[in-house]
A protein has these predicted regions:
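Extended, charge-biased low-complexity segments
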Residues: 1-155
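Acidic, proline/glycine-rich low-complexity IDRs
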Residues: 139-205
C-alpha cells in the first residue's frame, strides 16, 4: 500500500502543519446499534480496525512510512445510545457536520465518516468485518420513486472492509469520495457490494 506514498504523506504534512489538530489520521466512526451482544461486538470491531490497519501498513511498507503512520492513527469512536441509536445515514451526516459530541476527525478531500450499524455488528460473529463509509456533504436520499434508468448512480456512501481503512484514507488524500464509493443502478444494490480498491498504490494514487 505504501509504495510511492509520498503524495499521501506530503498531503498529511500540509494538513498537519496548517492546524495542530490535524497531527493524526483516521476516521470518526458512529455506532447506531445497541442490541443484545452489540457492546462486545463494538469493542471487537474497534480492536479489529486497528489490527487490520496496522497489518496493511506493515505488509506494504516502504521507506519506514508505517512507523510514522501507526502512532498517529486513530478511530474516533462515537457510541451514545441516547443520541445515535438507529439513526439514518442522513441524520448522521447532520450529526457529523454539526460536530455533535465534539470535532470529528480531520477531513481530507471529502468529509467521510464510518458507520457500524446493526448489520455490521451482527455480522462480526460470522467473521465479516464490514462498515459503511459516508460522505457528510451528500446525505443519502431515499430512492423514491425507484429509478428507471439503467445507468449507475453515485449515492454518497458505500460498504467497505476494515482492512481498507488506510486505502480509503490514501484515496481521499487526493480525490473526493466519488472515486472511492461504488456506483450502482439502485441504492439498495450497495447492500450487496464492497468497495474495490487497486492492490497497487501506483494505480490508486
Amino acid at each position: 500500500m505504501l509504495r510511492n506514498s509520498e503524495i499521501s504523506w506530503e498531503r498529511y504534512c500540509e494538513l498537519r502543519d496548517g492546524d495542530p489538530y490535524l497531527a493524526r489520521w483516521g476516521f470518526t466512526m458512529y455506532r447506531t446499534y445497541y442490541g443484545l451482544g452489540s457492546d462486545e461486538n463494538w469493542k471487537a470491531l474497534l480492536e479489529k480496525a486497528k489490527e487490520e490497519t496496522f497489518k496493511e501498513l506493515d505488509e506494504c511498507d516502504h521507506d519506514d512510512l508505517a512507523a510514522k503512520l501507526k502512532p498517529i492513527f486513530q478511530i474516533d469512536a462515537r457510541s451514545d445510545q441516547s443520541l445515535l441509536n438507529d439513526l439514518s445515514l442522513g441524520v448522521l451526516c447532520q450529526v457529523y457536520n454539526d460536530k455533535v459530541g465534539g470535532d470529528p476527525m480531520p477531513r481530507l478531500e471529502s468529509p467521510v465518516f464510518l458507520v457500524a450499524d446493526e448489520h455490521s455488528l451482527d455480522q462480526i460473529s460470522e467473521g465479516n468485518w464490514i462498515v459503511k463509509s459516508v460522505d457528510a456533504d451528500y446525505p443519502p436520499r431515499e430512492e423514491i420513486p425507484i429509478r428507471t434508468s439503467t445507468e449507475e448512480n453515485w449515492w454518497g456512501w458505500g460498504r467497505m472492509e476494515l482492512r481498507q481503512i488506510p486505502w480509503l484514507w490514501k484515496k481521499l488524500a487526493g480525490e473526493d469520495s466519488r472515486y472511492c464509493f461504488r456506483w450502482t443502478v439502485h441504492q439498495a444494490d450497495l447492500d450487496n457490494v464492497i468497495w474495490f480498491h487497486s492492490s497497487s498504490m501506483e494505480e490508486a494514487v
